[in-house]
Amino acid sequence: MEFLMILLIHQQDNVYKWIRESGAHLFRSTGDIQDNWESIKRLALSQIGSECYGGNFCHNDIDMLVVGMHGGSNNEWINSTEQGVNVIADSGETMPKLGGCTDEEYRTHFSLWAIMNSPLMIGCDIRRMTPATKEILTNKDVIAINQDIECRGPYCIKQWNNPDNVFSLVKPLANGDYAIGMFNFGDRAGEMSLQFWDIGLPAASGRGLSVYDCWKHEELGTFTERFVTTVEPHGCAVLRAKVVKV
């Protein structure tokens, strides 16, 4: 007989540091998610700095996915669109409810949960999925990052000129590749850059990165010293990069 042990802690102090000793296979470290961008952003940012504590056999569950709900959940907490009506579970403060997200925001949500090693539990009604929702939830390239056998936590590299809203998450993979998520939480499109020395690959190493785009499903080429791209507001780029000699 097999069983899965899940502990619901909801942001108890230092849960990351002691939860593995409990024997739990999954643990909740956040309040409940809601189907709006501000909730997704808040939960994701709450994980920055604690990425290293999850791992094989003890996974950090950032709550289910709201991808594809589009304001259509039958749960009042998740779906309310009234400004200031609901209360955020983990802080007690009110915030506006936006009645669902754009497909771009759902794509970012899925990418964040994947690279942060959270379980990818579908929350929408799969009988009513749009083609865009199905495309997001069945992206094999992004799912492969989440399911990497070594389950290493990512580390965060903040954009120097906008550290509160623009950052990259870099996750080493079992075969030596890097999974790279570049996220723009701001309200304007912006140019993002990843300097390779920040991941231990200076120009003097004679190595660069061969980069594959996990959402466009295409090879982008080989880059040295840095990778630069434009990321839409509330959007992301998810890359799989292989170290190559240049």
Identify what each model region corresponds to.
Residues G221-V246:
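C-terminal beta-strand-rich structural cap/linker in extracellular carbohydrate-active enzymes
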Residues I180, V211, H234:
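Hydrophobic, well-ordered secondary-structure elements that form the walls
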Residues T108-W160:
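Catalytic cores of secreted or luminal carbohydrate-active enzymes
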Residues R107, W113-M116, M121-G123, N161-A203:
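Carbohydrate-binding surface patches
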Residues L120, R127, E150, F185-D187, ...:
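Short, glycine-/Ser/Thr-/acidic-enriched flexible segments
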Residues G100-T102, N165-V170, R226-F227:
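Generic recognition of flexible, low-complexity loop/linker segments
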Residues W197-K216:
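Solvent-exposed beta-hairpin/edge-strand motifs
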Residues M1-D125:
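Glycan-recognition surfaces
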